[in-house]
C-alpha cells in the first residue's frame, strides 16, 4: 500500500518544459495552480515527471492554462539559498495525469 500519494485538480501555470540531464535522463517540469473556493486563495505546486513516455505526452498535450488532474507522490527538495540559509520545496513526482475540460466547458 502506497502511503505517500497526492491528487490535485487545477490549472497548468508554467508551460511544461523538458530538460535533458546527464546520465541519459530527462525531467519534464511544470506548475499547477489549485484555487480553493472556501478560502479564496490559490496554492501553487511544482510537478516533476521522470518517465520519458509520460513526459512526451505532457509536452504534446498540456499547455499553460489547461485544467488537469495530476496524481503522484510528494518529494521534499532541500537546497541552500544564495544567502547561505537552507530552504525546501515540495514537489509532486508525477505518476499520471488527465486533461480535463475547462470549468466553462463543464457548465455548457
Where are these regions (language model features)?
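Single-stranded nucleic acid-binding surfaces, predominantly the OB-fold ssDNA-binding core
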Residues: 1-108
